[in-house]
C-alpha cells in the first residue's frame, strides 16, 4: 500500500510565498512612510511641477532684486523721514531726528548687500501664486546666475542663483522665472557714474561728455555679455529640466532695463549751476542724458532681446516702464511737506551720498519696483511672446501701466 501524494504546492512552498508577500507589503508600507516623512520635513520633499504650491521666481541683479526699495520718491528734506520718503526711519522724536533700520525693507539681505526689498517686482506683482521668490542679488553679473557645474560663481557669500533655483524648483511648482541681468557685464552703472563725475568737474562752456567713451566701452563688452547671458538662460533651463519640468510647464522671461534719466527735453533743472546735483540728484549734461535714455540703453536692450530669441525665451522691454517718473523729469516732482504720492513722485532713487547708501542710487525706488511688478503681472496675463511696458505720466501705478506687443526686429 503506497502513501497518497499531494498534487498542489507543498506546505513549505506555501509558507515561503506567504513570507514573500508579507515582506513585499512591509516594504511598500516602509516606502510610503519614508515618502510621507520626506513630504513633512522642510527642504527634503521633491514635488517640483507636481507640488500643490505654485511660485514665481526672479534671478538677476540690482535692477530686479529691489535695490533702492527703501524710498518712496525723493524727498526735499535732508533729515528725519526725508519728507516721508524714507521707509527705514523709525523712532522719530519731536525734533525730527530718527533712527534708521534698513533691514525692515531688505530683511536678511541687508547684511550681505544683496538688497532684496519687500517691494521687489517679483514680490509686489499681483499674481495669484502661493510664493513669490526673489533670488536676485545686487551687483550680480551673468556668471553669478550660472550653475556651479557650468562655471557659476558665488556672489556676496551666496551660491550661484541657478543652484538656489534648483532647491525652489524641487520644492514648489514654479510657473515663471524672470531673469534680469547683463547691465553689470557691460558696466552700465559705472559708466553712468563716470558721466556724473564728468559733469561735476567741467562747466557748460567746455563740458566733459561721457557718451563717446561709454558707448565704445559698451560696444566692446556686449558680445561677451550676450554669450554670458545666453549661458545663464541655458543654466535656468537645465536646472528646471533636472527638477522634472518640461519647457511648457513654466514661462522663462528675460527682461531689459530702463534708464534712470529721461531725455534732456524733460529735465526740470538747467545744465548750468548745481541744481542738477544738489536738488535733483541727476548730474548729467544734456547730451549724456540723451545718450543714457536713448542709444546707451537701446543697445543693451537690443542685445538682450536677441539673446532671448535665440534661447526660445520671452522678452520684456522695460525702457518705457518708468516714463514721466525718472530722475528730474519735469512731469514728476520732489516729495514735499504733503508727503509722498505715487502719481506725482519720481520712481527712481536720486544720486545720493548722504542718505541711505550710494548703492541705492539710480535704481527703481519702492514706487518704481511696484510699477515693474504691475508690468510683470500684465505680462503674466498675456500669452507667451515679446512684450513692452509703458507708463503714463502723472497717474497712479495701477492706472499708469499698460503692456503692448513688442513690434519690430
Identify the meaning behind each predicted range.
Residues 5-27, 361:
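N-terminal export and membrane-targeting signals
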Residues 79-223:
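Conserved SGNH/GDSL esterase-like catalytic core that processes O-acyl groups on lipids
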Residues 189-223, 246, 259-297:
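Serine-dependent acyl-ester chemistry module
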Residues 259-363:
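Mobile gating loops/cap/lid regions near enzyme active sites that modulate substrate access
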Residues 341-398:
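Histidine-centered active-site loop/cap adjacent to the catalytic His
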Amino acid at each position: 500500500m503506497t502513501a497518497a501524494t499531494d498534487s498542489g504546492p507543498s506546505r513549505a512552498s506555501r509558507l515561503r510565498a506567504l513570507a514573500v508577500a508579507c515582506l513585499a507589503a512591509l516594504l511598500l508600507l516602509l516606502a510610503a512612510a519614508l515618502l510621507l516623512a520626506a513630504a513633512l520635513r522642510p527642504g527634503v520633499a521633491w514635488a517640483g511641477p507636481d507640488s500643490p504650491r505654485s511660485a514665481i521666481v526672479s534671478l538677476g541683479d540690482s535692477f530686479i532684486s529691489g535695490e533702492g526699495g527703501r524710498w518712496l520718491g525723493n524727498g526735499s528734506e535732508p533729515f528725519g523721514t526725508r519728507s516721508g520718503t524714507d521707509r527705514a526711519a523709525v523712532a522719530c522724536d519731536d525734533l525730527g531726528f530718527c533712527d534708521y533700520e534698513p533691514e525692515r525693507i531688505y530683511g536678511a539681505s541687508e547684511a550681505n548687500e544683496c538688497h532684496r526689498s519687500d517691494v521687489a517686482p517679483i514680490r509686489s506683482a499681483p499674481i495669484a501664486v502661493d510664493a513669490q521668490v526673489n533670488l536676485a542679488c545686487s551687483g550680480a553679473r551673468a556668471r553669478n546666475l550660472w550653475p556651479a557645474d557650468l562655471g557659476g560663481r558665488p556672489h556676496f557669500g551666496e551660491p550661484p542663483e541657478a543652484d538656489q533655483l534648483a532647491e525652489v524648483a524641487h520644492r514648489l511648482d514654479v510657473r515663471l522665472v524672470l531673469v534680469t541681468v547683463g547691465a553689470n557685464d557691460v558696466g552700465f552703472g559705472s559708466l553712468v557714474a563716470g558721466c556724473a563725475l564728468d559733469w561735476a568737474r567741467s562747466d557748460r562752456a567746455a563740458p566733459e561728455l561721457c557718451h563717446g567713451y561709454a558707448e565704445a566701452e559698451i560696444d566692446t563688452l556686449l558680445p561677451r555679455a550676450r554669450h554670458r547671458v545666453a549661458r545663464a538662460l541655458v543654466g535656468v533651463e537645465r536646472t528646471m529640466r533636472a527638477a522634472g519640468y518640461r519647457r511648457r510647464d513654466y514661462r522663462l522671461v528675460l527682461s531689459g532695463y530702463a534708464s534712470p534719466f529721461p531725455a534732456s527735453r524733460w529735465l526740470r533743472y538747467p545744465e548750468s549751476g548745481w541744481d542738477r546735483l544738489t536738488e535733483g540728484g541727476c548730474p548729467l549734461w544734456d547730451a549724456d542724458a540723451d545718450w543714457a535714455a536713448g542709444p546707451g540703453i537701446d543697445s543693451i536692450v537690443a542685445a538682450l532681446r536677441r539673446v532671448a530669441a535665440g534661447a526660445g525665451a520671452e522678452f520684456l522691454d522695460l525702457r518705457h516702464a518708468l516714463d514721466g517718473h525718472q530722475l528730474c523729469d519735469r512731469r514728476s516732482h520732489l516729495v514735499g511737506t504733503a508727503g509722498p504720492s505715487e502719481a506725482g513722485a519720481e520712481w527712481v532713487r536720486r544720486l545720493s551720498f548722504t542718505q541711505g547708501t550710494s548703492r541705492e542710487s539710480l535704481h527703481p525706488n519702492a514706487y518704481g519696483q511696484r510699477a515693474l511688478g504691475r508690468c510683470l503681472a500684465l505680462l503674466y496675463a498675456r500669452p507667451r511672446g515679446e512684450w513692452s511696458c509703458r507708463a503714463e505720466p502723472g497717474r497712479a501705478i495701477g492706472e499708469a501701466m499698460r503692456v503692448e506687443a513688442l513690434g519690430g526686429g
